[in-house]
Regions:
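Histidine-centered metal-chelating micro-motifs
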Residues: 90, 94-100, 119
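A short, compositionally biased micro-patch
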Residues: 68-70, 93, 103
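Short acidic-glycine-tyrosine-enriched beta hairpin
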Residues: 79-91
Length: 194
């Protein structure tokens, strides 16, 4: 019995050694085509070639999401596999264990990561945000209509434009407002799906 417990503990600990903790700061340093707001918000595009979770699982220290534009992938979130295809949004809670199990060569999702402090700065009604947070903890994959993806993609493009903008005085407020808009669109989609 004692040997069985030691073996199980050794297996868990060896898995943790291979788990990479990824900060938003690290993402903005290591990815190509990155747009960011300090260490609070990062938007980038991913590809099969720069898939960093294929070899080892990772855990991101903030909230994150991908919107699959083309291609397909199988993603493991906390040891549960999900098929991701175009017009799919996948949400990752902080410290979720993420691994890409399989990925087509043409897979191209948008990736967004944002810190807990960034979320706390956004003025969203708790009665609106809590059901969404709870839903994505249980069912992180949301299939959406192409029009929904296009609206969210346009908002992300606008956020990226503002991240490059010379309008520094109100940049944070503008980006928070656009992010809040994206959140409410996703909330609307989520309520429609229930």
């Amino acid at each position: 019995m004692a040997d069985t417990i030691k073996t199980a503990k050794a297996i868990r600990e060896s898995g943790r050694e291979n788990l990479r903790k990824v900060s938003i700061s690290r993402i903005k340093k290591e990815m190509n085509d990155v747009f960011y707001l300090s260490d609070d918000l990062v938007i980038t595009t991913l590809s099969a070639q720069n898939n960093t979770t294929a070899e080892y699982p990772a855990s991101i220290d903030g909230f994150s999401a991908i919107i699959m534009m083309t291609g397909e992938a199988t993603v493991s979130i906390d040891m549960q596999n999900y098929n991701v295809k175009p017009n799919t949004i996948v949400f990752f809670n902080p410290d979720s264990i993420i691994r890409t199990v399989k990925c087509s060569a043409n897979a191209a999702p948008y990736f967004l990561a944002f810190s807990k402090s960034f979320v706390n700065e956004i003025q969203i009604d708790l009665s609106t945000s809590l059901p969404v947070y709870m839903r994505f903890g249980k069912a992180p994959v949301l299939e959406v209509a192409p029009q929904d993806v296009d609206e969210i993609r346009q908002l992300f493009q606008l956020i990226k434009t503002m991240l490059r903008s010379d309008k520094e005085r109100y940049r944070h407020e503008i980006i928070r407002t656009l992010f809040t808009t994206a959140f409410y669109i996703i909330t609307e989609i989520n309520q429609r799906e229930q």
